Amino acid sequence: MSDQKKNILSTPMTRAEALRSMVAGVVAGAFGLSACSEPKRTEQVTIAGKGGRVSLKRNPRNGDEVSLLGFGCMRFPTVGGDRYTGRIDREPTREMLEYAYERGVNYYDTAWMYHRGDSEGMVGEVLKQYPRDSFFLADKMPPEAKTLEQAKEIFATQLQRCGVEYFDYYLCHSISRQYVFQNLYLNEGVLEYLLEEKRRGRIRQLGFSFHGDLALFEWLLALPVEWDFVQIQMNWLDWRDETRISEKLYNLLAERELPVIVMEPIRGGSLIDLPQSVTTMLRENDPAMTAAAWALKFCASYPYVLTVLSGMSRMEHVVENCDTFTDFQPLSDEQIELLHRAAEQYRNNTRIDCTDCLYCMPCPYEVDIAGIFRTYNRCFDDQLLPNPDSAHDEEYLRRRRVLLNRYKNNVKPDGRAERCIGCNQCSPKCPQSLHIPTELKRVEELVERVRQEWK
């Protein structure tokens, strides 16, 4: 064990002090950017950015100097549809990736299924212009693989798509059920194959991304495998939520001194447009800090977090997030506690815990699951969900009108919730463990009830 890690484990210190002992801030000359389209986020973003390079974190297991901000390559801008139906809008995506690289982002996370297989090629196309030892590329073995031969073919294709000879970080993707892991990775021998690829040097660090329960997590860590890192969902809203267990997962990894890669730090964007009461709490503490910065800094303020992935879809997201991690300073313990209080305030409302990952898609009956949940949650975030049991005053009528108009404009008639027959093929795919037909029924009943009152 390194002296640095021994100190972190053995010396009493605050969470902020522990992080400062591991973070290396790297500052360089300013890098400008011309203005682009109006930000989608509700808070003002300075497109030019403040310049400088994002701070680095040293991986104590192998010495990698990894940017605290990692580029999640699942939410690139698209044309002709969304991430499932459209294709990557290549020029703005290239500009975003190049800007991030120039600002010091050196960790790029892609996967077989992202953008229907086009993410890997897009990332490889951009990164090939840079020295191979100047960035870290992460890819994943998809759940779609069923046999060892399929896994070998997929791995070879991934290297080819990305235009590289090795992956710096490679993951068993989206582990959520023990029998699935046993069938593919143990019975089919795919885990041993990946370990062999690691011995050959085509995988430098091997880990897994996780979406299951605590028992499965402990079982995975108990396997006779030397995992190099683990990727978990982590955000301030779910941290102390017993149904989400993210705090317990992090603590188990910290006990084993395993580097943590964070996914969904902004919860699929749902921690951007916060309820007004929560926004007020945070702004009273720091009027200049955006909701995205609060979410990203929360995750990076834990000492065993190596990098925080953000699935950025607009240039202003990239600029803002790079600014957040330039000359990075962790949140204070008081600010961490403020976020815990904010989470309690947030949970006083009811929201559908969808992160818009699209893993549930496509629906065999063409229900636009993500679009329905997105519309419902946006009304919730804007505090515009109508309550049919409340007084039918002007405010209720306004909320009813907003919900029905948004539902009509954002969800096509042949993709609405009433088309769900409850086959439940979608729920096992959901990383948030949602029972999707139940949530669709909830939306359908609300929409239908206020629609009947409209007549």
Please identify what each model-predicted range represents.
Residues 2-135, 178, 193, 199:
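N-terminal binding-site loop/beta-alpha segment at the start of enzyme catalytic domains
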Residues 86-100, 148-161, 212-220, 292-295:
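Short, acidic/polar
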Residues 384-423, 452-455:
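Short Fe-S-cluster ligation motifs
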